[in-house]
Amino acid sequence: VIGGVECNINEHRFLVALYTSRSRRFYCGGTLINQEWVLTAAHCDRKNIRIKLGMHSEKVPNEDAQTRVPKEKFFCLSSKTYTKWDKDIMLMRLKRPVNNSTHIAPVSLPSNPPSVGSVCRVMGWGTITSSQETHPDVPHCANINILDYEVCRAAYPELPVTRRTLCAGILEGGKDSCNGDSGGPLICNGQFQGIAYWGADTCAQPREPGLYTKVFDYTDWIQSIISGNTDATCPQ
């Protein structure tokens, strides 16, 4: 996260970090939506995913931090056919559920979509500088705004007209999610509204906001899968 500050240790109990058995570094974020399920971006899929819950500082782990592996993964499209612009969402079922604790608690799915102008909080262990990467020990948080989708279409002309995507950032630049924040949550007015998935090569530039999968549009799909209907189809 560019232009943010260290998150309050108590404000991100639902934030998880993804790493692989090979590389110890957190490469993506994710969001705990109940005791057994994590939502992230499809492009965060890897062979040997490890999921860290209840983390704040990597160097000094919380005593209630937990590690899990996924038992099942679900994609809107087969994991490799989502496009750069569309349906970048993955639901992972934990092999063992986690209990709520001081630093672990799920966030609920949104009951309404966010409106343009909403103030939202983006968070993650991604780089805090853009051209050279600097990975922080603790997650950083920044407040950004939901912008009109047309702002993103102006910045990225190849964006499709249909929108299951939120456009969010600061028009004048300076605050943004960045490399390593993908898959993590965008929280607007206390509701989990977006999954970070794409931004310009240099983060936090003026008029180049980030793109976030619009969680609200996928709530039926998510709830169907969680309730056992694994053939549920994604919104078109």
Curated annotation (Swiss-Prot):
GO BP annotations, alphabetical order: proteolysis
Group of enzyme by EC: hydrolase
Keyword Cell inner membrane included in the entry's annotation: no
InterPro entries hit by this protein: Peptidase_S1_PA (IPR009003), Peptidase_S1_PA_chymotrypsin (IPR043504), Peptidase_S1A (IPR001314), Trypsin_dom (IPR001254), TRYPSIN_HIS (IPR018114), TRYPSIN_SER (IPR033116)
Annotated transmembrane regions: none
Active site: 43, 88, 182
Subunit text: Monomer.
Role this protein plays: Snake venom serine protease that may act in the hemostasis system of the prey.
Protein name: Snake venom serine protease ussurin
UniProt source species: Gloydius ussuriensis
